[in-house]
Amino acid sequence: IAQLPPGPGVVVRSGGSSGGSRCCAQPSLHLDRSAAATAHWLTGIGVDPASTLLLNPLPLAHVSGLMPWWRARCWGAGHQQLEPGLMKTPAELLAFCQGLPTWGKNPAVLSLVPTQLARLLAHPDGVAFLQRLQLIWIGGAALPAPLADQARALQLPLAPCYGSTETAAMVAALPPDRFLAGEPGCGDPLVDVELRLAADGALEVRTDRLALGCWRADQPERWEPLRDGDGWWRSGDQAALTPGLQIAGRIDGAIHSGGETVFPEQLEQRLMAALQAASLPVSAVLLLAVDDPEWGQRLVALVGSSDPAVLQRLEALTRPWPPAETPRRWLLCPDLAPSALGKWQRQRWREWLKRLDAAEA
């Protein structure tokens, strides 16, 4: 507590996708700046921020759930929290929203993660709900290509975006018209943001709303500033600027297999696209690295299914892949799912794999 800066603010937990976790200190002023930049973006696409109804299905303890409420507070807009149970029952969700006083009158804006979008798209009432929205910000994880194609076919106003706890949420967003025209990625930086790439391809961000510092869960007494001497923060995400922002995956998630650098997150997206094209009943795929005496590291695939026949089809689908990108093991894991924020808790599933190996030893 003594290390916290003076003045009002919040301490918000970040991380989880690569096994790490830390808490970031964000002054209230930084959250205000973030809300102002997002309002500027909305105005640029013809939406009056003050007129919006912000629907929020994300936890308030995370920046992705905190910021819709904070934006509404700054803009004088409406805010409605959506309980987790509603997001899993699209018929009840649609009925609930139809009962809101401003539903159908004010432009409804929703923040989602890809997992939530997929669940809604799988149900007619979920599709009906999504089609009533003015704007759908989608972030927290990569948007799989099949999901994007499905949203475009339904003419859903998706706005893929990128941000983090460290940046007080959104720093780049793709307008819905460009998304519907087929443009990939997360669009251009917001008005108060600069983006660049480090020599190794890592995305770096400079903005006046970067967190003042953070603590790691395993070193709570150590305060870590985020900025370098020139004000840049290294995100740890592999990216391209072409010119819009394209996120390839976590640099710290890359593995080295047989002399090749492999990004499991990219391969997971390819696998899910192949699974959808083949109409295979798989809820998710997660690739984990294990040590290998010959290759250095090899991939093990956890597959969200209970059908052994699916594994045979997956092996056949990936047979043409380069050896470094091809999993050496395929394991059924019916309970496989990301967190409520759509992020993979890879350390949790590594522990699951260790327990499985120990039981089979």
Question: Which residues make up each language-model segment?
Answer:
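Gly/Ser/Thr-rich phosphate-binding loop
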Residues: 122-180
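Conserved S/T- and glycine-rich ATP-binding loop of Class I adenylate-forming
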Residues: 14-17, 54, 69, 110, ...
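Conserved pre-ATP/AMP-binding loop-to-beta segment of ANL
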Residues: 1-13, 45-52
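Conserved C-terminal "lid"/linker of ANL adenylate-forming enzymes
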Residues: 288, 300-304, 316-361
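Conserved ATP/PPi-binding loop(s) of AMP-dependent carboxylate-activating enzymes
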Residues: 189, 199-230, 250, 260-262
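AMP-binding/adenylate-forming catalytic core of the ANL superfamily
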Residues: 207, 231, 236-325
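AMP-binding/adenylate-forming
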Residues: 26-41, 53-119, 159
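Conserved AMP-binding A3 loop
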Residues: 9-36
